[in-house]
């Protein structure tokens, strides 16, 4: 399965490179975020049927068999060696360094819970800082999910009789 994914990703990346379009251009043409387009082309996200025609219009050489492959639920995984890439390493370092403070602020603002990475939007933007130098803006926009108190009366398996085998 991993080899099939690697082959698909290689084909998708080749098509993107051949198109000469950036992730931002593809995002604009499809109505998706730039990161989601990158996730699609890395088989880390699921191509929805209503989005497939937009992606096909943005990448006209995208063959139907790859579109059908992209519409299957992906194997969301990563190569553990990717952490050695300096950009990925620094992202991980930033999350680890700021994570505890971010968690504390989420809890202070929302209560005991987490930010979803399922109902989640992510984008990368380029802005100029006050010093005129380029800056990277990462936006993580996740739904807040409160932790629930585990009451037995809310536990579906306990609210109806268990079937005997």
Curated annotation (Swiss-Prot):
Lineage of origin: Eukaryota, Viridiplantae, Streptophyta, Embryophyta, Tracheophyta
Family as reported in the entry's similarity comment: Belongs to the cyanase family.
Record: active site: 90, 93, 116
Keyword Iron: no
The keyword Metal-binding belongs to this UniProt entry's keyword annotation: no
One GO BP: response to salt stress
Catalytic activity from the UniProt record: cyanate + hydrogencarbonate + 3 H(+) = NH4(+) + 2 CO2
Molecular function terms, GO-annotated: cyanate hydratase activity; DNA binding; identical protein binding
Stated role: Catalyzes the reaction of cyanate with bicarbonate to produce ammonia and carbon dioxide.
Gene3D superfamilies per UniProt: Cyanate lyase, C-terminal domain, lambda repressor-like DNA-binding domains
EC number from the UniProt entry: 4.2.1.104
InterPro entries according to UniProt: Cro/C1-type_HTH, Cyanase, Cyanate_lyase_C, Cyanate_lyase_C_sf, Lambda_DNA-bd_dom_sf
Region (Disordered) location: 1-20
Class of this enzyme: lyase
Pfam families documented for this protein: Cyanate_lyase
Name of the protein in question: Cyanate hydratase
Keywords: Lyase
């Amino acid at each position: 399965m991993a080899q099939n994914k690697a082959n698909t990703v290689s084909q998708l990346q080749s098509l993107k490179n051949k198109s000469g379009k950036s992730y931002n251009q593809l995002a604009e043409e499809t109505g998706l975020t730039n990161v989601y387009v990158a996730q699609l082309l890395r088989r880390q996200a699921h191509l929805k049927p209503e989005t497939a025609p937009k992606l096909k219009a943005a990448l006209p050489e995208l063959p139907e068999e790859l579109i059908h492959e992209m519409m299957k639920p992906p194997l969301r995984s990563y190569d553990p060696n990717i952490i050695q890439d300096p950009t990925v390493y620094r992202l991980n370092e930033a999350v680890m360094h700021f994570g505890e403070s971010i968690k504390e602020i989420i809890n202070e603002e929302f209560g005991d819970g987490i930010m979803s990475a399922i109902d989640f939007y992510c984008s990368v933007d380029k802005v100029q800082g006050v010093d005129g130098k380029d800056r990277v803006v990462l936006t993580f926009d996740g739904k807040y999910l409160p932790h629930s108190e585990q009451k037995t009366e809310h536990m579906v398996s306990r609210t109806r009789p268990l079937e005997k085998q």
